[in-house]
């Protein structure tokens, strides 16, 4: 593994000691562990010899951009560097930063310790200490026994706050160390910034939303204009959390002194900081971010047929780095397949990205036209397993050859079998499902509840009449209504003394007509309990069928299902055939179930935790709109990309918060913030800091609710904790006085811990 060091620059007369400082950086970066990418953002020709003289270094590349007529944008230059970086992790290294070889070794070791190749949501800042002129001379003229001892000497001087050495610190600095995939996905720097000023804080704000180390400050959006770490106020203090810990491990850069630079139009401090607050609030409210950046190392060009104002667009951004050069356009801009084909040919598009192609008739026509012309495409939608999604270049659901036996029937190794067995065990015993279900109650409880006795159970889960698979892949049943007719026929002909038919409506479908002669489970009854209870499962083509195979239950399909193959689920041709299958022995081939599941888990399905917003369709039925997907693994085109999970928060009792006064001082700051704002409520999670979305939500101009871990006031009859919360809300002064008095003997009422 290597790390790409990105150096953005434009060499001019005003760039102090440009050649000397650049050469020093290159000499100090270990070639075996780092690659160097210089982004030449419009250096005039008369200074080009400085860069030409560097081309002999094997670990260095120079990207030249003809941007000399534009204001120098260090943010844009960094973005370009990430787009062309060949390594999975990047480090931003400005020309005035100084670190010796040992310091870069420490940075490399930190990246390895965090496994940042496979944990993409993790990041840190290399703290930067701005040296005085004397401090710069001292650093560059030092003659220590080793680089390690030199770094210890400098670290001590910084720690002891020698004013003649360091002018000021920046713990949450622009020297970010970040995963390339993640950076491309969030879009890099906002294109709204002009010149220099505040652009790094916007990036840090968004990066930190995926990895929150603690509660955000009560006045988070406030620019305190101070980088000190003794007061937990404003966003600068919050971003410092991403550099304090690595500084304590001896990792830092020194910013070498230089005369004040005067570049017309470059410094846009006032304008950009005003813009920063608006961008931060937009992101917190609506997840507004710049468009994802193209990955220049993937030469394909992909057209995404998607509305960039939609929540789906925001949710899929961590898929985009896989698809090279990115073009985003609404499908409605193409009146028919001919107009789409013209655009593809004119703009040299290599691939089309579709959301569910059966989502509407217009999209389906475009999809079928693209397939007919053998144009490469990719289809994205939710899978049948919890947290599963698929990127399929063969088709959609039943119409895809990705599920054909030749794709998945292969001998598994013992390790592969163990992997699948472990997944199936966890799936069967988990409460996690695609749709909301109540807590599990066991199949034994249901057997008593429904008075099953010794009878067998046929479980029938219904689907929504408007779903894609019940509309386009309805097969022999024809429709949900047709399938209900099957169930009614079977109910009339199955001996009631031998069988019980238990039906369950889809959680979002409240108005489906009921079938006579069957039992109905409550809408929120846990689907796993019902499957576990069943002897056989009859359905159209629901994902419940795939989960039922994990329980090794015989599954009979009345419609076209992608998992209906010999040894797995069995297709029925009509209601009479379905009845015969119910009455006869039907076996599930465990070996084939393991093979199919291994294929799904390692070749077809990607996985990511998602959040949804509930809304109403135009016909009044309930509907869920995707809000966010935090992918942890992506399977695409025989590649597996591990993204990892969003790191957990850190306890307020951790040394990370000592400089801010620890838990007690930080809670006092929240209390003081409440006193200054009218009607503020503090709602505190007394267990852990786990939610990376902790922030203040302003409910009105004069009233706000400080949400820590998004835990809201409990409206139920209060117990001991509830009474304390009420006291906290109504009389915060008395609450905190009592809490401080009792802190030594009772530390469990008001705390953050892991």
Model-flagged regions — what are they?
Residues 16-18, 440-507:
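Conserved catalytic-core segment of nucleotide-activated headgroup transferases in glycan assembly
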Residues 12-29:
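Short, well-formed alpha-helical segments that are part of the catalytic scaffolds
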Residues 399-448, 568-684, 688, 723, ...:
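Leloir-type glycosyltransferase catalytic cores
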Residues 17-18, 195-300, 683-686, 734-749:
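C-terminal catalytic/acceptor-binding lobe
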Residues 87-100:
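Short beta-strand-to-loop acidic/aromatic patch adjacent to the donor-nucleotide binding site
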Residues 68-84:
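Glycine-rich, basic loop-to-helix element that forms the pyrophosphate-binding segment
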Residues 40-54, 485-521:
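Catalytic donor nucleotide-activated moiety binding site of glycosyltransferases and closely related
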């Amino acid at each position: 593994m290597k790390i790409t060091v990105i150096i953005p620059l434009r060499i001019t007369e005003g760039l102090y000691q440009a050649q000397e400082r650049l050469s020093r950086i290159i000499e100090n970066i270990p070639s075996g562990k780092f690659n160097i990418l210089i982004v030449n953002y419009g250096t005039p020709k008369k200074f080009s010899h400085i860069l030409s003289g560097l081309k002999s270094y094997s670990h260095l590349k120079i990207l030249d951009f003809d941007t000399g007529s534009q204001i120098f944008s260090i943010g844009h230059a960094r973005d370009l560097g990430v787009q062309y970086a060949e390594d999975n992790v990047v480090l931003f290294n400005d020309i005035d930063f100084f670190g010796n070889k040992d310091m870069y070794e420490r940075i490399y070791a930190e990246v390895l310790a965090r496994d940042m190749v496979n944990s993409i949501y993790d990041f840190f800042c290399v703290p930067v200490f701005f040296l005085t002129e004397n401090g710069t001379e001292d650093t560059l003229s030092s003659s220590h026994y080793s680089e390690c001892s030199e770094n210890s000497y400098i670290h001590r001087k910084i720690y002891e706050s020698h004013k003649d050495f360091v002018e000021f610190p920046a713990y949450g600095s622009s020297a970010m160390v970040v995963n390339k995939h993640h950076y491309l996905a969030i879009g890099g720097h906002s294109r709204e910034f002009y010149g220099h000023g505040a652009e790094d804080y916007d990036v840090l704000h968004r990066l930190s939303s995926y990895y929150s180390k603690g509660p955000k400050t009560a006045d988070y959006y406030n620019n305190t204009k101070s980088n000190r770490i003794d007061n937990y106020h404003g966003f600068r203090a919050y971003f410092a959390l991403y550099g304090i810990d690595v500084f304590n491990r001896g990792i830092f850069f020194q910013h070498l002194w230089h005369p004040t630079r005067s570049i017309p139009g470059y410094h846009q401090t006032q304008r950009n900081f005003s813009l920063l607050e608006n961008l931060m609030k937009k992101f917190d409210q609506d997840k507004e971010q710049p468009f994802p950046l193209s990955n220049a190392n993937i030469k394909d060009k992909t057209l995404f047929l998607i509305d960039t104002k939609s929540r789906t667009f925001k949710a899929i951004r961590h898929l985009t780095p896989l698809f090279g050069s990115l073009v985003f356009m609404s499908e409605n801009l193409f009146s028919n397949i001919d107009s789409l084909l013209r655009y593809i040919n004119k703009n040299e598009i290599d691939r089309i990205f579709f959301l569910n192609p059966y989502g509407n008739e217009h999209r389906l026509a475009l999809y079928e036209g693209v397939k007919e012309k053998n144009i490469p495409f990719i289809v994205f939608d939710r899978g049948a397993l919890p947290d599963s999604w698929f990127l399929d270049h063969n088709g959609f659901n039943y119409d895809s050859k990705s599920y054909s036996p030749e794709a998945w029937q292969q001998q598994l190794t013992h390790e592969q079998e163990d992997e699948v067995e472990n997944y199936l065990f966890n799936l069967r015993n988990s409460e996690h499902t695609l749709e909301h279900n109540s807590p599990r109650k066991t199949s034994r409880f249901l057997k008593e509840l429904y008075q099953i006795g010794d009878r067998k159970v046929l479980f029938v889960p219904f689907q929504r009449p408007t779903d894609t698979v019940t509309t386009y892949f309805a097969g022999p049943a024809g429709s949900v209504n047709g399938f209900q007719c099957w169930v009614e026929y079977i109910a009339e002909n199955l001996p009631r003394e031998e069988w019980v038919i238990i039906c369950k409506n889809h959680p979002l479908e409240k108005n489906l007509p009921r079938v006579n002669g069957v039992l109905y489970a409550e809408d929120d009854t846990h689907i796993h309990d019902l499957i576990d209870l069943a002897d056989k499962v009859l359905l159209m083509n629901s994902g419940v069928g795939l989960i039922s195979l994990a329980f090794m239950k015989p599954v009979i399909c009345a419609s076209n299902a992608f998992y209906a193959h010999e040894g797995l689920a069995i297709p029925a041709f009509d209601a009479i055939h379905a009845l015969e299958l119910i009455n006869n022995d039907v076996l599930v081939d465990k070996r084939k179930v393991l093979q199919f599941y291994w294929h799904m888990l390692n070749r077809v399905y990607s996985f990511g935790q998602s959040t949804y917003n509930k809304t109403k369709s135009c016909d009044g039925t309930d509907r869920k709109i995707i809000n966010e997907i935090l992918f942890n693994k992506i399977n695409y085109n025989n590649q597996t990309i591990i993204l990892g999970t969003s790191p957990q928060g850190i306890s307020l009792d951790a040394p990370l918060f000592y400089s801010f006064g620890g838990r007690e001082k930080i809670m006092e700051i929240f209390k003081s913030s409440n006193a200054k704002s009218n009607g503020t409520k503090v709602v505190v999670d007394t267990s852990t800091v786990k939610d990376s979305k902790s922030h203040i939500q302003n409910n009105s101009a004069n009233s706000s609710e400080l949400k820590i871990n998004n835990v809201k006031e409990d409206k139920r009859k209060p117990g001991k904790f509830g009474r304390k919360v009420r006291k906290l809300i109504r009389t915060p002064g008395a609450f905190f006085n009592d809490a401080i008095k009792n802190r030594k003997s009772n530390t469990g009422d008001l705390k953050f811990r892991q």
